[in-house]
Amino acid sequence: VRILIGGYRPYEIGIFKPDQKEVTVLKAFIRNKLLEYIDEGAEWFIIQGYTGIELYAAEEIIRLKEAHYDISLGVLMPFHQFDDRYNEMDQALLQKVLAESDFKDYIYKQPYSNPGMFKHINRFLISNTDGALIFFDEEADAKVRFLYNAILEFSGENPYNIERIQFDEINSFIDSGFDN
């Protein structure tokens, strides 16, 4: 089973430093979700390599692999130079994730050229996975909205599992006794 992971960029959820407590909480929450998916038979986790939820998930997947879970990480980057605007720390994290991934490639083997690419990228990701774990609130104005809407459209005509995580669920996780 191949699971696509998508979600917020750090700035979309008020995260501006990697050592903020919110990052620790999100990673613990993501780890719990990953373990649920592994228990249900997930073998591959797919990300595009965007900062925030995707790279947090990648870090947790790598930790789980180091703990001998039999899972794989695929990084399907959207196009060449998609990470040009990443700061030095994010560039280093992406390079570490790519080095530890089991598969990495570009969906488009060229730099960005037109907005239509994103629609094709989303379609490619969805049609090559069995389900998605998406961190997204309807009220939030986030880039992941486009992926989420594409998944909804696809799942209307095809068997595709989608789990959408909203802020309420993360807050419940914190309230239930998450303690770092």
Functional labels for PLM-detected ranges:
Residues 3-179:
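Acidic/glycine-enriched connector segments
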